Amino acid sequence: MGIPFPAGKALDALAAESDSTDSFSVKLRELSFSLSGVENQVKQRLERGVPAADVARFALNTVVRLIRRVTERAQKEYPGLPVLFSGGVASNALLRREMGEQVLFAEPRYSTDNAMGVAILTLRALERGLI
């Protein structure tokens, strides 16, 4: 789609240019899922010449609706357990709007692409003396 990495902010801005409500239904197995079908759908839409803004909105609509379903299912399975969103996806405007008050969001400075993963990998590398 021609957006820079990390892509979170750019994808958010691109998707905001579209009012598409299209999404792909991702299958859930308990609290597990795979996004490979979504990836294929995104590629196919781009190959068909669907505008990048509509493809971005499609991808975000799909992921946000999936996260909502998984979160609601987890909250039913574990009532009263708080849910905290952090990392790159947690800074997405559509997700924040959709999830509203039912979850907690980390501050934007803690919600950057791969922040948690990079921190964990760095700690492990330090512990092993690799850096």
Give residue ranges: language-model regions:
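Acidic, glycine-enriched active-site microenvironments
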Residues: M1-I131
